[in-house]
């Protein structure tokens, strides 16, 4: 078969017309060095600060240093097989994590990937890990309580929904225990919880997850994990990921509680990244923006007003305020609260619960030091009955501390001083509480009422805990309706006062402790 020139030219024109060229513009770069999880890239002219950079093998790095002739990026995950000359691409996206109710009851890593072996995570979409905190106009004052279940905290250092309350102390003083008990106490409160574990041993985290499951609190909690064996980048980003997951509930008119355990390790991970990126070191070798590291995280914990929620949900949720309450944990060295990171976080938060190793070792647990622990905004949120009955507790403890110091040097004490010392010791004993045993508002009120109204005066110090246990058992058995009424209303009036007095009088008459 012979084709003439006209047919050939027509065929060529037809093929040219059918030829479809798809052009894609990629912003590509080349790795010029790999060192301790930090890669230097040449050629990414249009990269953004914080942008995800696609690496070979379905991995990502985050651009942190934008320099004149190169980009410094931190690899999220293993980097041993990365080498000079490899090609990388800009993605045009910043880091996002899955958010939604499907994450409740799950254990995930910094990127929101499940690590509990329960299959894929169901989510309602993705949210950027770095978000701007709500402005002043979008906020509402804190006036609803978060009950931790600890008498000493709820009575003297109350926490409100939308507050940032620092938990600070040396290692092994019960910081994590306090935070975990606060999460366990939210089982029936409707508050969703997020627990962020940074730089801890995997065995410790597994134990925490098991305890949450045992006490029925895991179904209400998201656990975000960046263990000590993971890269500094994942440890640095874990609190931001957890915060994004908590903000999902805040922005939809619900209440959430987030625990950062702990921010000291996050600061150390960020210091490591900054030094490897050759950023100039400052005090304690931390970079200059370590304050901003924590302030931009903790400012996202807030109580937002109904207008903000309605606007965010496009009118789907009306008349509801949302909140995200933060309990950041900081570990001190030998009780030094004036170190760089502790002072930073103290100045950012709305108060601190200071746990002392000397109190912990003396058997006073939770080891709260009421002298330097404070809640700056929680007073307005405190339950009415607890607020009324706890007024004299802090004063009694402060006087007891002062007199106890002087009584070591004085041989003979007058009756009034001896009485104050005795009352202070009994209040200290009454505020002791076992782990994983949070108390309801009614139970706390009953204990505080007994101390406030002098029912402990004729009880021996060694018998105070037995007295309280027997009192609560008696109240549950004989006056369950009164406890239920106090738990539901949280109010305090002459009628409730009379009922509490009658309850304690009848219990004292039984002498059964």
Curated annotation (Swiss-Prot):
It is an enzyme of class 7 (translocase). GO terms for cellular component: plasma membrane; proton-transporting ATP synthase complex. Its main location: membrane. It is a peripheral membrane protein. It catalyses: ATP + H2O + 4 H(+)(in) = ADP + phosphate + 5 H(+)(out). It comes from Photorhabdus laumondii subsp. laumondii (strain DSM 15139 / CIP 105565 / TT01) (Photorhabdus luminescens subsp. laumondii). This is ATP synthase subunit alpha. Produces ATP from ADP in the presence of a proton gradient across the membrane. The alpha chain is a regulatory subunit. It is found in: Cell inner membrane. Disulfide bonds: none annotated. The record marks 373 as: Required for activity. One of its GO terms (molecular function) is ATP binding. Belongs to the ATPase alpha/beta chains family.
């Amino acid at each position: 078969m012979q084709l003439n020139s006209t047919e050939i030219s027509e065929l060529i024109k037809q093929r040219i017309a059918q030829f479809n060229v798809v052009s894609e513009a990629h912003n590509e770069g080349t790795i010029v060095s790999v060192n301790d999880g930090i890669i230097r890239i040449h050629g990414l002219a249009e990269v953004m600060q914080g942008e995800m950079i696609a690496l070979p093998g379905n991995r990502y790095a985050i651009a942190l240093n934008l320099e004149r002739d190169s980009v410094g990026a931190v690899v999220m995950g293993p980097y041993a097989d990365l080498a000079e000359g490899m090609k990388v691409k800009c993605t045009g996206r910043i880091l996002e994590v899955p958010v939604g109710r499907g994450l409740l009851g799950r254990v995930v890593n910094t990127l929101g990937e499940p690590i509990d072996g329960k299959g894929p995570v169901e989510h309602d979409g993705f949210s950027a890990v770095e978000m701007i905190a709500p402005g002043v106009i979008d906020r509402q004052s804190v006036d609803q309580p978060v009950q931790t279940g600890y008498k000493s905290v709820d009575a003297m250092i109350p926490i409100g929904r939308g507050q940032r309350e620092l938990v600070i102390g040396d290692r092994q003083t019960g910081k994590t225990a306090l935070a975990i008990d606060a999460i366990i106490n939210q089982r029936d409160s409707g508050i969703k919880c997020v627990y962020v574990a940074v730089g801890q041993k995997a065995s410790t985290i597994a134990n925490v997850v098991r305890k949450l499951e045992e006490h029925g609190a895991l179904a209400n909690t998201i656990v975000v994990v960046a263990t000590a064996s993971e890269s500094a980048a994942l440890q640095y980003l874990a609190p931001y990921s957890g915060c994004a997951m908590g903000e999902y509930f805040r922005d939809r008119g619900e209440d959430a509680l987030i625990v950062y355990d702990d921010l000291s390790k996050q600061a150390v991970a960020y210091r490591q990244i900054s030094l490897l990126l050759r950023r100039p070191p400052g005090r304690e070798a931390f970079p200059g923006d370590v304050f901003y590291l924590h302030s931009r995280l903790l400012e996202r914990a807030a109580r937002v007003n109904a207008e903000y929620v309605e606007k965010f949900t496009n009118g789907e949720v009306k008349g509801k305020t949302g909140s995200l309450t933060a309990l950041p944990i900081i570990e001190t060295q030998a009780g030094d609260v004036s170190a760089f990171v502790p002072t930073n976080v103290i100045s950012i938060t709305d108060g601190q619960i200071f746990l002392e190793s000397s109190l912990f070792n003396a058997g006073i647990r939770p080891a709260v030091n009421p002298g330097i622990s404070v809640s700056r905004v929680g007073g307005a949120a405190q339950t009415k009955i607890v607020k009324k009955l706890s007024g004299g507790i802090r004063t009694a403890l402060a006087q007891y501390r002062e007199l106890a110091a002087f009584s070591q040097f004085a041989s003979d004490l007058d009756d009034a001083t001896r009485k104050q010392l005795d009352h202070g010791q009994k209040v200290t004993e009454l505020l002791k509480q076992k782990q994983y045993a949070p108390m309801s508002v009614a139970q706390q009120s009953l204990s505080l009422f007994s101390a406030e109204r002098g029912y402990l005066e004729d009880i021996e110090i060694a018998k105070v805990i037995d007295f309280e246990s027997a009192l609560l058992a008696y109240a549950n058995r004989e006056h369950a309706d009164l406890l239920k009424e106090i738990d539901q209303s949280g109010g305090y009036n002459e009628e409730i006062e009379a009922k509490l007095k009658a309850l304690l009088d009848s219990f004292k008459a039984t002498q059964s402790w």
